[in-house]
Amino acid sequence: MSNQSVKTDMIIVGAGPVGLFAVFEAGLLGLKCHLIDNLDRPGGQCTELYPEKPIYDIPSRPKVTGQELVDDLLKQISPFNPVFHLNQQAQSLERLENNNWQMTTSQGEVLEAPIIVVAAGAGSFVPKKPKYPDLEIYEEKSIDYAVYKMSKYQDKELVIVGGGDSALDWVMSLEPIAKKITLVHRREGFRSSP
């Protein structure tokens, strides 16, 4: 943690696909970028929620997984040497007398740039954990909040909780490899898209 600010051309809040592509576009203009993201790796929801799930709505890509998309974007921006500030959030933003912006992260890093890009998508990914005593004992053993490797669920009996797009997408994606899937949902109808 340093109070001395790091000066750059552009600060991007969010290291998902839009933030990564912003690095590419800025790089073409000769701008240096620093990215801030709450997660421990670039990729946003693509790597956090569906790294192995096919995505069908990326221009020029008939089908690509979330991880493949992020890997390709990281290759595309590597010549521009972006600096990542991971596992932290943008905490404060202040306009300076020189008309630059000063952003402080949750870890106390101070960045300064004339350009701020907010590419935060749906915001930082924080799972909605049920209020259940000692739940953390089972996390990463038998409770997962995201699917990172589908092969982990091969021939397993699974319980998926939720009624939104993500829950139903994972039921459909895991159905061919799981032994059994039970979907638990507390409402009468589903919130997912048709």
Give, region by region, the residue ranges found by the protein language model.
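FAD-binding core/adjacent interface of flavoenzyme oxidoreductases
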Residues: 1-13, 28, 41, 84-156
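Rossmann-like dinucleotide/flavin-binding elements
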Residues: 2-7, 11-40, 142-191
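N-terminal Rossmann-like dinucleotide/flavin-binding domain of flavoprotein oxidoreductases
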Residues: 3, 47-110, 190-194
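Residues within well-formed alpha-helices
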Residues: 21-25, 76, 112
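Short amphipathic alpha-helical segments
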Residues: 23-25, 47-48, 128-132, 171-173
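Glycine-rich, phosphate-binding/catalytic loops in enzymes
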Residues: 29-30, 51-53, 132-136, 176-178
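Short, contiguous clusters of charged residues that form electrostatic/catalytic patches at enzyme active sites
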Residues: 71, 75, 88, 141-145, ...
